Amino acid sequence: MAAVETRECETEGCHSEAKLQCPTCIKLGIQGSYFCSQECFKGSWATHKLLHKKAKEDKTNDEEKNCVEKEVNTDPWPGYRYTGKLRPYYPLTPMRLVPSNIQRPDYADHPLGMSESEQTMKGTSQIKILNAEEIEGMRVVCKLAREVLDIAAMMVKPGVTTEEIDHAVHLACTARNCYPSPLNYYNFPKSCCTSVNEVICHGIPDRRHLQEGDILNIDITVYHNGYHGDLNETFFVGEVDEGAKRLVQTTYECLMQAIDSVKPGIRYRELGNIIQKHAQANGFSVVRSYCGHGIHKLFHTAPNVPHYAKNKAVGVMKPGHVFTIEPMICEGGWQDETWPDGWTAVTRDGKRSAQFEHTLLVTETGCEILTRRLEDNGRAHFLSQM
Protein backbone atom coordinates (compact mmCIF):
# COMPACT_ATOMS: atom_id res chain seq x y z
CA MET A 1 0.00 0.00 0.00
CA ALA A 2 1.16 3.54 -0.71
CA ALA A 3 2.17 6.04 2.00
CA VAL A 4 0.04 9.24 2.02
CA GLU A 5 -0.63 12.30 4.14
CA THR A 6 -2.30 11.67 7.51
CA ARG A 7 -6.02 10.83 7.36
CA GLU A 8 -8.52 9.00 9.56
CA CYS A 9 -8.92 5.25 9.02
CA GLU A 10 -12.05 4.45 7.05
CA THR A 11 -12.69 1.11 8.73
CA GLU A 12 -16.02 1.32 10.54
CA GLY A 13 -15.46 2.03 14.25
CA CYS A 14 -11.75 2.81 13.85
CA HIS A 15 -10.63 6.43 14.17
CA SER A 16 -6.89 5.84 14.16
CA GLU A 17 -4.50 7.87 12.08
CA ALA A 18 -4.30 6.46 8.55
CA LYS A 19 -1.28 6.73 6.29
CA LEU A 20 -1.99 3.90 3.86
CA GLN A 21 -4.19 3.95 0.77
CA CYS A 22 -5.59 1.03 -1.22
CA PRO A 23 -3.36 0.58 -4.31
CA THR A 24 -6.27 -0.60 -6.47
CA CYS A 25 -8.21 2.55 -5.60
CA ILE A 26 -5.22 4.66 -6.64
CA LYS A 27 -5.08 2.81 -9.96
CA LEU A 28 -8.82 3.24 -10.54
CA GLY A 29 -8.83 6.89 -9.48
CA ILE A 30 -11.08 6.34 -6.45
CA GLN A 31 -10.75 9.12 -3.88
CA GLY A 32 -10.27 8.26 -0.20
CA SER A 33 -9.76 4.62 0.83
CA TYR A 34 -7.37 5.33 3.72
CA PHE A 35 -6.50 2.76 6.38
CA CYS A 36 -4.35 2.67 9.49
CA SER A 37 -2.98 -0.84 8.96
CA GLN A 38 -3.04 -3.92 6.79
CA GLU A 39 -5.26 -5.56 9.39
CA CYS A 40 -7.92 -2.84 9.09
CA PHE A 41 -7.65 -3.00 5.31
CA LYS A 42 -8.18 -6.77 5.30
CA GLY A 43 -11.03 -6.46 7.79
CA SER A 44 -12.85 -4.03 5.49
CA TRP A 45 -12.17 -5.97 2.30
CA ALA A 46 -15.60 -7.59 1.95
CA THR A 47 -17.31 -4.21 1.57
CA HIS A 48 -14.38 -2.20 0.26
CA LYS A 49 -13.92 -4.36 -2.85
CA LEU A 50 -17.41 -3.34 -3.98
CA LEU A 51 -15.96 0.12 -4.69
CA HIS A 52 -13.55 -1.48 -7.15
CA LYS A 53 -16.35 -3.35 -8.90
CA LYS A 54 -18.47 -0.22 -9.28
CA ALA A 55 -15.53 1.84 -10.54
CA LYS A 56 -14.69 -0.80 -13.16
CA GLU A 57 -18.32 -0.98 -14.31
CA ASP A 58 -18.53 2.82 -14.53
CA LYS A 59 -15.29 2.92 -16.51
CA THR A 60 -16.55 0.27 -18.93
CA ASN A 61 -19.84 2.11 -19.42
CA ASP A 62 -18.03 5.42 -20.01
CA GLU A 63 -15.64 3.85 -22.52
CA GLU A 64 -18.51 2.19 -24.35
CA LYS A 65 -20.48 5.45 -24.45
CA ASN A 66 -17.48 7.40 -25.72
CA CYS A 67 -16.77 4.76 -28.35
CA VAL A 68 -20.32 4.92 -29.68
CA GLU A 69 -20.51 8.72 -29.53
CA LYS A 70 -17.30 9.14 -31.50
CA GLU A 71 -18.51 6.72 -34.21
CA VAL A 72 -14.92 6.29 -35.34
CA ASN A 73 -14.36 3.51 -37.85
CA THR A 74 -10.71 2.61 -38.22
CA ASP A 75 -9.34 -0.16 -40.42
CA PRO A 76 -7.44 -2.23 -37.85
CA TRP A 77 -5.33 -4.03 -40.46
CA PRO A 78 -4.11 -1.62 -43.17
CA GLY A 79 -2.99 -3.53 -46.23
CA TYR A 80 -4.92 -6.70 -45.40
CA ARG A 81 -6.63 -8.12 -48.49
CA TYR A 82 -10.21 -8.99 -47.53
CA THR A 83 -11.80 -11.85 -49.42
CA GLY A 84 -15.22 -10.20 -49.69
CA LYS A 85 -17.05 -6.92 -49.14
CA LEU A 86 -17.47 -7.15 -45.36
CA ARG A 87 -15.23 -4.97 -43.18
CA PRO A 88 -14.73 -4.82 -39.41
CA TYR A 89 -16.02 -1.73 -37.62
CA TYR A 90 -13.37 -0.71 -35.09
CA PRO A 91 -12.66 0.17 -32.33
CA LEU A 92 -14.57 -2.53 -30.50
CA THR A 93 -16.42 -1.63 -27.33
CA PRO A 94 -14.79 -2.92 -24.11
CA MET A 95 -15.28 -6.47 -22.87
CA ARG A 96 -18.42 -6.65 -20.74
CA LEU A 97 -18.42 -7.61 -17.08
CA VAL A 98 -20.36 -10.51 -15.56
CA PRO A 99 -21.72 -10.12 -12.01
CA SER A 100 -19.53 -11.90 -9.47
CA ASN A 101 -22.44 -13.95 -8.10
CA ILE A 102 -22.78 -15.85 -11.41
CA GLN A 103 -20.86 -19.12 -11.63
CA ARG A 104 -17.98 -18.87 -14.09
CA PRO A 105 -16.13 -21.44 -16.22
CA ASP A 106 -12.45 -21.95 -15.45
CA TYR A 107 -11.25 -19.78 -18.35
CA ALA A 108 -13.34 -16.71 -17.43
CA ASP A 109 -10.59 -15.06 -15.38
CA HIS A 110 -7.57 -16.69 -16.98
CA PRO A 111 -5.29 -14.05 -18.57
CA LEU A 112 -5.16 -16.05 -21.81
CA GLY A 113 -8.72 -17.32 -21.51
CA MET A 114 -7.37 -20.86 -21.33
CA SER A 115 -9.54 -23.70 -20.05
CA GLU A 116 -7.33 -25.90 -17.90
CA SER A 117 -10.03 -28.58 -17.76
CA GLU A 118 -10.21 -28.72 -21.56
CA GLN A 119 -6.44 -28.78 -21.88
CA THR A 120 -6.35 -31.80 -19.56
CA MET A 121 -8.68 -33.69 -21.91
CA LYS A 122 -7.05 -32.48 -25.13
CA GLY A 123 -6.23 -35.28 -27.53
CA THR A 124 -8.50 -37.85 -25.93
CA SER A 125 -11.08 -39.67 -28.04
CA GLN A 126 -12.94 -41.04 -25.02
CA ILE A 127 -16.55 -39.81 -25.09
CA LYS A 128 -18.22 -39.14 -21.77
CA ILE A 129 -21.52 -40.89 -21.04
CA LEU A 130 -23.64 -38.54 -18.95
CA ASN A 131 -25.64 -39.82 -15.99
CA ALA A 132 -29.21 -38.78 -15.19
CA GLU A 133 -28.16 -35.77 -13.10
CA GLU A 134 -25.78 -34.54 -15.79
CA ILE A 135 -28.40 -35.00 -18.50
CA GLU A 136 -30.85 -32.90 -16.51
CA GLY A 137 -28.18 -30.22 -16.13
CA MET A 138 -27.77 -30.19 -19.91
CA ARG A 139 -31.52 -29.95 -20.47
CA VAL A 140 -31.70 -26.91 -18.23
CA VAL A 141 -28.74 -25.06 -19.75
CA CYS A 142 -29.81 -25.80 -23.32
CA LYS A 143 -33.30 -24.46 -22.62
CA LEU A 144 -31.71 -21.26 -21.29
CA ALA A 145 -29.45 -20.99 -24.34
CA ARG A 146 -32.50 -21.33 -26.59
CA GLU A 147 -34.26 -18.51 -24.70
CA VAL A 148 -31.26 -16.25 -25.26
CA LEU A 149 -31.08 -16.99 -28.99
CA ASP A 150 -34.80 -16.32 -29.36
CA ILE A 151 -34.28 -12.89 -27.77
CA ALA A 152 -31.43 -12.15 -30.17
CA ALA A 153 -33.59 -13.28 -33.09
CA MET A 154 -36.13 -10.54 -32.39
CA MET A 155 -33.45 -7.88 -32.92
CA VAL A 156 -32.40 -8.89 -36.43
CA LYS A 157 -33.33 -6.13 -38.87
CA PRO A 158 -31.59 -3.55 -41.06
CA GLY A 159 -29.90 -0.77 -39.10
CA VAL A 160 -29.20 -2.79 -35.96
CA THR A 161 -25.55 -3.41 -35.10
CA THR A 162 -24.18 -6.78 -34.06
CA GLU A 163 -22.75 -4.96 -31.03
CA GLU A 164 -26.32 -4.14 -29.97
CA ILE A 165 -27.28 -7.78 -30.40
CA ASP A 166 -24.27 -8.83 -28.31
CA HIS A 167 -25.32 -6.40 -25.57
CA ALA A 168 -28.82 -7.88 -25.50
CA VAL A 169 -27.37 -11.39 -25.42
CA HIS A 170 -25.10 -10.48 -22.51
CA LEU A 171 -27.99 -9.04 -20.50
CA ALA A 172 -30.22 -12.02 -21.31
CA CYS A 173 -27.51 -14.40 -20.10
CA THR A 174 -26.87 -12.64 -16.81
CA ALA A 175 -30.62 -12.21 -16.19
CA ARG A 176 -30.84 -16.02 -16.31
CA ASN A 177 -27.88 -16.47 -13.98
CA CYS A 178 -25.78 -17.67 -16.91
CA TYR A 179 -22.24 -16.82 -17.97
CA PRO A 180 -21.97 -16.18 -21.75
CA SER A 181 -19.55 -18.98 -22.65
CA PRO A 182 -17.69 -17.23 -25.51
CA LEU A 183 -16.66 -14.30 -23.28
CA ASN A 184 -12.87 -14.50 -22.72
CA TYR A 185 -12.75 -18.06 -24.09
CA TYR A 186 -9.16 -17.95 -25.34
CA ASN A 187 -9.64 -14.16 -25.09
CA PHE A 188 -12.67 -13.94 -27.38
CA PRO A 189 -13.88 -10.40 -26.61
CA LYS A 190 -17.67 -10.72 -26.82
CA SER A 191 -20.61 -12.68 -25.42
CA CYS A 192 -21.73 -14.29 -28.68
CA CYS A 193 -20.53 -14.81 -32.25
CA THR A 194 -22.18 -12.92 -35.11
CA SER A 195 -21.21 -14.02 -38.62
CA VAL A 196 -22.37 -11.94 -41.60
CA ASN A 197 -22.42 -13.01 -45.27
CA GLU A 198 -18.95 -14.44 -46.12
CA VAL A 199 -18.09 -15.01 -42.45
CA ILE A 200 -18.21 -18.75 -41.80
CA CYS A 201 -18.08 -18.61 -38.01
CA HIS A 202 -16.61 -16.82 -34.97
CA GLY A 203 -17.46 -13.33 -36.19
CA ILE A 204 -16.87 -10.68 -33.52
CA PRO A 205 -19.83 -8.35 -32.85
CA ASP A 206 -19.03 -4.74 -33.75
CA ARG A 207 -20.71 -1.44 -34.65
CA ARG A 208 -21.41 -2.20 -38.31
CA HIS A 209 -25.10 -1.69 -39.09
CA LEU A 210 -26.82 -4.71 -40.60
CA GLN A 211 -27.91 -4.06 -44.16
CA GLU A 212 -30.93 -5.14 -46.16
CA GLY A 213 -30.07 -8.42 -47.87
CA ASP A 214 -27.44 -9.59 -45.37
CA ILE A 215 -27.56 -13.05 -43.86
CA LEU A 216 -26.54 -13.24 -40.20
CA ASN A 217 -25.64 -16.22 -38.04
CA ILE A 218 -25.92 -15.77 -34.27
CA ASP A 219 -24.10 -18.41 -32.22
CA ILE A 220 -25.07 -18.63 -28.55
CA THR A 221 -23.48 -20.68 -25.79
CA VAL A 222 -24.32 -20.21 -22.12
CA TYR A 223 -22.82 -21.69 -18.95
CA HIS A 224 -25.13 -22.50 -16.04
CA ASN A 225 -24.65 -24.69 -12.98
CA GLY A 226 -21.46 -26.16 -14.44
CA TYR A 227 -22.79 -27.01 -17.93
CA HIS A 228 -22.60 -25.39 -21.39
CA GLY A 229 -25.47 -25.28 -23.90
CA ASP A 230 -24.72 -24.37 -27.54
CA LEU A 231 -26.82 -23.54 -30.61
CA ASN A 232 -26.97 -21.19 -33.58
CA GLU A 233 -29.23 -20.11 -36.42
CA THR A 234 -28.84 -18.07 -39.59
CA PHE A 235 -31.29 -15.20 -40.17
CA PHE A 236 -32.35 -13.05 -43.10
CA VAL A 237 -31.85 -9.31 -42.63
CA GLY A 238 -34.88 -7.79 -44.33
CA GLU A 239 -35.49 -9.01 -47.88
CA VAL A 240 -32.80 -11.30 -49.28
CA ASP A 241 -32.16 -12.69 -52.76
CA GLU A 242 -33.11 -16.18 -53.89
CA GLY A 243 -29.50 -17.35 -53.63
CA ALA A 244 -29.44 -16.53 -49.92
CA LYS A 245 -32.74 -18.35 -49.41
CA ARG A 246 -31.45 -21.49 -51.16
CA LEU A 247 -28.20 -21.45 -49.19
CA VAL A 248 -29.86 -21.02 -45.80
CA GLN A 249 -32.63 -23.53 -46.55
CA THR A 250 -30.12 -26.15 -47.70
CA THR A 251 -27.90 -25.60 -44.67
CA TYR A 252 -30.85 -26.14 -42.34
CA GLU A 253 -31.84 -29.28 -44.23
CA CYS A 254 -28.27 -30.58 -43.90
CA LEU A 255 -28.47 -30.22 -40.13
CA MET A 256 -31.91 -31.80 -39.80
CA GLN A 257 -31.08 -34.74 -42.07
CA ALA A 258 -27.98 -35.44 -40.00
CA ILE A 259 -30.01 -35.23 -36.78
CA ASP A 260 -32.53 -37.72 -38.18
CA SER A 261 -29.75 -40.31 -38.37
CA VAL A 262 -28.57 -39.94 -34.76
CA LYS A 263 -29.11 -43.07 -32.65
CA PRO A 264 -27.01 -45.64 -30.78
CA GLY A 265 -24.62 -47.59 -32.99
CA ILE A 266 -24.14 -44.90 -35.64
CA ARG A 267 -20.54 -43.89 -36.28
CA TYR A 268 -19.84 -40.18 -35.88
CA ARG A 269 -18.05 -40.15 -39.23
CA GLU A 270 -21.33 -41.01 -41.00
CA LEU A 271 -22.80 -37.58 -40.27
CA GLY A 272 -20.42 -35.93 -42.71
CA ASN A 273 -21.49 -38.26 -45.51
CA ILE A 274 -25.13 -37.28 -45.03
CA ILE A 275 -24.40 -33.56 -44.86
CA GLN A 276 -22.05 -33.38 -47.84
CA LYS A 277 -24.36 -35.46 -50.04
CA HIS A 278 -27.23 -33.02 -49.54
CA ALA A 279 -25.06 -29.91 -49.81
CA GLN A 280 -23.42 -31.03 -53.05
CA ALA A 281 -26.75 -32.08 -54.55
CA ASN A 282 -27.80 -28.45 -54.21
CA GLY A 283 -24.57 -27.01 -55.60
CA PHE A 284 -22.93 -26.05 -52.30
CA SER A 285 -19.74 -27.03 -50.46
CA VAL A 286 -19.02 -28.02 -46.85
CA VAL A 287 -16.45 -26.28 -44.64
CA ARG A 288 -13.77 -28.69 -43.42
CA SER A 289 -11.83 -26.62 -40.87
CA TYR A 290 -14.55 -26.40 -38.20
CA CYS A 291 -16.52 -29.27 -36.69
CA GLY A 292 -19.20 -30.17 -34.20
CA HIS A 293 -18.04 -31.29 -30.77
CA GLY A 294 -18.88 -32.92 -27.50
CA ILE A 295 -20.21 -30.55 -24.87
CA HIS A 296 -21.26 -30.75 -21.22
CA LYS A 297 -19.08 -29.50 -18.36
CA LEU A 298 -16.51 -28.68 -21.05
CA PHE A 299 -17.28 -26.20 -23.83
CA HIS A 300 -15.46 -28.32 -26.44
CA THR A 301 -14.46 -31.96 -26.01
CA ALA A 302 -14.76 -35.41 -27.64
CA PRO A 303 -16.29 -36.43 -29.95
CA ASN A 304 -15.03 -34.44 -32.90
CA VAL A 305 -17.86 -34.23 -35.46
CA PRO A 306 -16.73 -33.32 -39.01
CA HIS A 307 -19.44 -32.30 -41.47
CA TYR A 308 -17.71 -33.44 -44.68
CA ALA A 309 -17.71 -36.88 -46.31
CA LYS A 310 -15.08 -39.59 -45.90
CA ASN A 311 -13.76 -38.10 -42.66
CA LYS A 312 -11.94 -40.13 -40.03
CA ALA A 313 -13.93 -39.18 -36.94
CA VAL A 314 -13.51 -41.63 -34.08
CA GLY A 315 -16.38 -43.04 -32.07
CA VAL A 316 -19.78 -44.72 -32.11
CA MET A 317 -22.90 -43.09 -30.67
CA LYS A 318 -24.11 -44.41 -27.32
CA PRO A 319 -26.97 -43.38 -25.03
CA GLY A 320 -25.80 -40.53 -22.81
CA HIS A 321 -23.50 -38.91 -25.37
CA VAL A 322 -24.10 -35.17 -25.82
CA PHE A 323 -22.64 -33.30 -28.79
CA THR A 324 -23.32 -30.64 -31.40
CA ILE A 325 -23.88 -30.85 -35.13
CA GLU A 326 -23.26 -27.46 -36.77
CA PRO A 327 -22.66 -27.65 -40.55
CA MET A 328 -21.21 -24.61 -42.31
CA ILE A 329 -22.27 -24.60 -45.96
CA CYS A 330 -20.83 -22.30 -48.65
CA GLU A 331 -22.05 -20.89 -51.98
CA GLY A 332 -18.62 -21.29 -53.52
CA GLY A 333 -15.57 -23.24 -52.38
CA TRP A 334 -15.16 -24.68 -48.89
CA GLN A 335 -11.70 -23.18 -48.29
CA ASP A 336 -11.43 -20.61 -45.51
CA GLU A 337 -9.03 -18.11 -44.04
CA THR A 338 -8.98 -16.11 -40.82
CA TRP A 339 -8.90 -12.36 -40.35
CA PRO A 340 -5.95 -10.92 -38.40
CA ASP A 341 -8.14 -10.79 -35.27
CA GLY A 342 -7.43 -14.52 -34.97
CA TRP A 343 -11.13 -15.40 -34.85
CA THR A 344 -13.21 -14.33 -37.84
CA ALA A 345 -13.24 -17.23 -40.34
CA VAL A 346 -14.26 -16.21 -43.87
CA THR A 347 -14.65 -17.95 -47.21
CA ARG A 348 -11.52 -17.63 -49.29
CA ASP A 349 -13.53 -16.70 -52.39
CA GLY A 350 -15.66 -14.12 -50.54
CA LYS A 351 -18.94 -15.93 -51.20
CA ARG A 352 -21.60 -16.41 -48.55
CA SER A 353 -21.74 -19.12 -45.90
CA ALA A 354 -24.57 -20.23 -43.61
CA GLN A 355 -24.73 -22.38 -40.48
CA PHE A 356 -27.19 -24.01 -38.07
CA GLU A 357 -26.43 -25.84 -34.83
CA HIS A 358 -28.18 -27.94 -32.20
CA THR A 359 -26.96 -29.68 -29.06
CA LEU A 360 -28.14 -33.31 -29.06
CA LEU A 361 -28.52 -36.09 -26.51
CA VAL A 362 -28.27 -39.67 -27.77
CA THR A 363 -31.15 -41.69 -26.26
CA GLU A 364 -31.90 -45.43 -26.28
CA THR A 365 -33.91 -45.13 -29.50
CA GLY A 366 -32.66 -41.98 -31.23
CA CYS A 367 -31.89 -38.51 -29.99
CA GLU A 368 -33.31 -35.55 -28.10
CA ILE A 369 -32.71 -32.07 -29.51
CA LEU A 370 -31.84 -30.26 -26.30
CA THR A 371 -31.79 -26.81 -27.95
CA ARG A 372 -35.04 -27.29 -29.88
CA ARG A 373 -37.19 -24.20 -30.29
CA LEU A 374 -40.37 -24.44 -28.22
CA GLU A 375 -42.48 -22.28 -30.54
CA ASP A 376 -43.58 -22.93 -34.13
CA ASN A 377 -43.22 -26.69 -33.77
CA GLY A 378 -39.47 -26.34 -33.29
CA ARG A 379 -38.84 -24.77 -36.70
CA ALA A 380 -35.94 -22.37 -37.23
CA HIS A 381 -36.78 -18.65 -37.30
CA PHE A 382 -35.82 -18.10 -40.96
CA LEU A 383 -38.67 -20.33 -42.15
CA SER A 384 -41.18 -17.68 -41.13
CA GLN A 385 -39.27 -15.23 -43.37
CA MET A 386 -39.47 -17.39 -46.50
From Swiss-Prot:
Query: Which residues belong to zinc fingers classed as C6H2-type?
Result: 6-59
GO MF, one term, reads:
initiator methionyl aminopeptidase activity
Can you tell me which residues bind Zn(2+) 4? 230, 293, 326, 357
Entry's localization field: Cytoplasm
At the top level of its lineage, which domain of life is listed?
Eukaryota
Keywords in alphabetical order: Aminopeptidase, Cytoplasm, Hydrolase, Metal-binding, Protease, Zinc, Zinc-finger
Q: Does the keyword Protease apply?
A: yes
Sites binding a protein sit at 202, 300
Any single GO CC term annotated in Swiss-Prot or TrEMBL for this entry: cytosolic ribosome
Which free-text remark accompanies the cofactor?
Binds 2 divalent metal cations per subunit. Has a high-affinity and a low affinity metal-binding site. The true nature of the physiological cofactor is under debate. The enzyme is active with zinc, cobalt, manganese or divalent iron ions. Has high activity with zinc; zinc cofactor is transferred into the active site region by the ZNG1 zinc chaperone.
Cofactor(s) needed, names only, are:
Zn(2+); Co(2+); Mn(2+); Fe(2+)
Give the binding site residues for Zn(2+) 3.
Answer: 219, 230, 357
- What InterPro entries does the record point to? Creatinase/aminopeptidase-like, Pept_M24, Pept_M24_MAP, Pept_M24A_MAP1, Zfn-C6H2
So what does this thing catalyse? Answer: Release of N-terminal amino acids, preferentially methionine, from peptides and arylamides
Q: What is one GO biological process annotated to this record?
A: intracellular zinc ion homeostasis
Q: Where does Zn(2+) 1 bind?
A: 9, 14, 36, 40
Q: Say which family it is in.
A: Belongs to the peptidase M24A family. Methionine aminopeptidase type 1 subfamily.
Question: Its biological function?
Answer: Cotranslationally removes the N-terminal methionine from nascent proteins. The N-terminal methionine is often cleaved when the second residue in the primary sequence is small and uncharged (Met-Ala-, Cys, Gly, Pro, Ser, Thr, or Val).
Spell out the HAMAP family in the cross-references: MetAP_1
Quaternary structure and partners: Associates with the 60S ribosomal subunit of the 80S translational complex.
- Its name, as the record gives it, is Methionine aminopeptidase 1
Which organism's genome codes for this protein? Danio rerio (Zebrafish)
